[in-house]
């Protein structure tokens, strides 16, 4: 989106080769802190981790690019094995809903005309780091189990407590509301960790874009937003 390239601080996506890590991360983004509302995102994600909810790591760094000082950048972890380990969870898969129908089939200027309930129910499950997952029999089995949970949620064919880890999900949604960080709940942005011990999903904090305005434009708990009916399902 335009906020990642319109200014003087363009966003960068970094993937380390081999076993290389930077600050313990193998995959991360570097971007203007304004993109995630400056320190608000850092505070929100740290609050999640303090309450044992999953989130990506987020910190600020002084970036030098090809010898040029670029100033302070936000370093935002992307989904990886290291991210799971940093959250003190056992290795598992991270799944989400494919956003093809949203961005490829319907241009952004058509979004106001979309029937969001149909888009949500029609979106296909997807997995992060597919190559690594498919190289492991155990992770592949987890992937298909997690996919089945996502499909059950789309069809509302079971109880929310059978899909989500109730304590972590409840705290996650409560903190999201307290921080006005509902942007991260958008069905095309939310990612879930499949916990192989409980066989349930846990939401991952990412791109919440929290605001101090109590009437945040993403406040689904106040006026509802049908495109994010996974939230309505989880709140059951």
Each predicted region: which residue ranges?
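Short, solvent-exposed loop/turn and secondary-structure capping segments
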Residues: 25, 73, 85-89, 185-191, ...
